[in-house]
Amino acid sequence: MSSDHLRKIKFPCLIKPAQSHTYYEVFRKKMAVVNNLDELEVKFNECKKNNINVTVQEIIVGDICRGLNFNSLFFNGKIMQGFTAYKIRMTDDGYGIPIVVRGRRMIDELWEYSEKLLNKIGYEGYSCIEYKFDESDGLYKLLEVNGRYNRSSLLSVKSGINFPWIEYNYLIYNKDFAHKGYRKNIYYIDEFKDIQINIKKLLKGKQNLFPFLKPYFTTHVFAIFSIKDTKPFFKHILDGLIMMFSAKKSKFSNNNSTNRT
């Protein structure tokens, strides 16, 4: 990166990996916030040392709820089905993954932006494009394009748009489809992460009880629990217990080893 580029960077900003999983495997988080040029150099060199390609991304000012997902199926130069939701709660103080998301009405502006973008990059199929409304200039800013299904895709299914099933039938059986409406104001909840993060905030007085509970008492879909198939839910609990006891056992063994020394 040239010195001219460095001078144009506004701090704080984000160090963001080209491939999220490679960064997470090393640093156990999705990205890093840097506040000055020295921090940027340190974080960049850490990534370079671990052969992780990264980009520098501007931080868009605004609350978490200003972040939006635009899910769509794009074929033959146009969006054939769309779905919009906005973020309610996220991990890592708003820089991680969405753990509570709420479906909302379609935003025509995002439809137009997304169609132009997908045309330009020559992408076809399902995508989840993330935007954030910039309160400083009143414009939607592009964050990233995810060319894959993720767990929050369950929200669109619960709302009446089964993207995987529509795409499967289109690709395998050539079944055409047209955009249809969907139910709004349904919540997606990543129940384990939401409870883990926000119980701590509730105990410290950093989270109000009513806003925390509201999604659970409104129409919602969980990331893992389903009354139709409870095995993944109990498997997740079992895996968590195994990890917890393994960590305690490892800590106990290390303490004994230190004492013997």
PLM regions and their residue ranges:
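Glycine-rich phosphate/pyrophosphate-binding beta-alpha loops
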Residues: 88-92, 97-99, 146-161
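Short, conserved loop/turn and helix-capping segments at secondary-structure boundaries
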Residues: 104, 108, 157-162
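Active-site nucleotide/adenylate-binding loops and adjacent lid/helix of ATP-dependent enzymes
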Residues: 1-55, 76-78
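Peripheral (often C-terminal) accessory segments that flank ATP-dependent C-N-forming ligase machineries
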Residues: 169-261
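Phosphate-binding site of ATP-dependent enzymes
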Residues: 35-93, 105-115, 132-133, 139-141
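Internal helical hairpin/lid segments
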Residues: 149-150, 165-172
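Conserved metal-phosphate-binding beta-hairpin within the catalytic cores
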Residues: 119-154
